[in-house]
């Protein structure tokens, strides 16, 4: 599901809310989440999961085109850990 699909489905299920308002709300939620992670804070949505930053240590990588070794710097990457309710719900669907 893409962001556009999400907006479309939410707008269809919320007849009283125009698609433009749904789109603005989704964009604001995602912006706030990105901003929170950018500040180094953790996001927890009970029953769904949590978003945090994990540190990737510096390492030696490889350029796939040339095969040359490349030094990669350490960096923080977003990480999602699903909550118990989401994990159980997904496993029931199988």
From Swiss-Prot:
Gene Ontology molecular function: any one: structural constituent of chromatin
GO cellular component, as recorded: chromosome; cytosol
SMART domains: BHL
Gene3D superfamilies, per database record: IHF-like DNA-binding proteins (4.10.520.10)
Keywords: DNA recombination, DNA-binding, Transcription, Transcription regulation, Translation regulation
Superkingdom: Bacteria
Keyword presence, Transcription: yes
Entry keyword annotation includes Ribosomal protein: no
GO BP terms in the entry: DNA recombination; regulation of DNA-templated transcription; regulation of translation
UniProt subunit comment: Heterodimer of an alpha and a beta chain.
Similarity comment: family membership: Belongs to the bacterial histone-like protein family.
Function: This protein is one of the two subunits of integration host factor, a specific DNA-binding protein that functions in genetic recombination as well as in transcriptional and translational control.
Name of this chain's protein: Integration host factor subunit beta
Protein species of origin: Aeromonas hydrophila subsp. hydrophila (strain ATCC 7966 / DSM 30187 / BCRC 13018 / CCUG 14551 / JCM 1027 / KCTC 2358 / NCIMB 9240 / NCTC 8049)
